[in-house]
Amino acid sequence: MPFEIVFDGAKDFADLIATASNLIDEAAFKITEEGISMRAMDPSRVVLIDLNLPESIFSKYEVEEEETVGINMDHFKKILKRGKNKDTLILRKGDENFLEITFEGTAKRTFRLPLIEVEELELDLPELPFTAKVVVLGEVLKEAVKDASLVSDALKFIARENEFIMKAEGETNEVEIKLTLEDEGLLDLEVEEETKSAYGISYLADMIKGIGKADEVIIRFGNEMPLQMEYPIRDEGKLIFLLAPRVED
């Protein structure tokens, strides 16, 4: 069998795939001895998605040889949603062109998902000279995006020495969410210089759908530069989005 991978807590894995699937229809997952990785761009080429899951976060990780598997993300998401919190998730691939997805809990349930041909693009995750790093709770980000969507299609991020502001302005109204390190929702703030940039709300909404209210989200950005949003996964794994800025007139 080319690989057998076991992940304790099926729902956590499902949330991860659901978040990525909001932006991409299909993906090529690279399975190596070191772990699982995936890098893709959304169809509009506005968001880069980078997933890295080292073998150490899995309770069992057996890979015979490096392999790339193409997966329909919507079908994968729908199957994974059938997993319960306490279920163990088992991913297997034999010689046939199927991914076997098994949930072990009160019963053993197995799905077989046909693999597909996916074009592998050479995509680099650029190292950008960000001037602000912000760590917030998922709840803060989710509420800010919901608030901003009422008044505009863009959300401006502003980082200063002692505060982080998210602001949206419409033709007749506006909303501002302000955080300092005294607020529970802002966990860390590092600012080299006052930094401002705006981003499309529809993309932000897709990027944060799968995160929990108590999850930590690491945001890095620069003046009119892409926004890098990172979700740590069980300490060693991570899901990163790189979102192009909304250029203001």
UniProtKB/Swiss-Prot annotation:
MF (Gene Ontology): DNA binding; DNA polymerase processivity factor activity
Lineage top rank: taxon: Archaea
Keywords: DNA replication, DNA-binding
Pfam family name, one: PCNA_N
Biological processes per GO annotation: leading strand elongation; regulation of DNA replication
Coiled-coil residue spans: none
InterPro entries: DNA_clamp_sf, Pr_cel_nuc_antig, Pr_cel_nuc_antig_C, Pr_cel_nuc_antig_CS, Pr_cel_nuc_antig_N
Family named by the database record: Belongs to the PCNA family.
NCBIfam families, A to Z: pcna (TIGR00590), PRK01115.1-2 (NF002219), PRK01115.1-4 (NF002221)
Role according to the record: Sliding clamp subunit that acts as a moving platform for DNA processing. Responsible for tethering the catalytic subunit of DNA polymerase and other proteins to DNA during high-speed replication.
Assembly behavior: Homotrimer. The subunits circularize to form a toroid; DNA passes through its center. Replication factor C (RFC) is required to load the toroid on the DNA.
Name of the featured protein: DNA polymerase sliding clamp
Source species of the chain: Thermococcus onnurineus (strain NA1)
Lineage: Archaea, Methanobacteriati, Methanobacteriota, Thermococci, Thermococcales
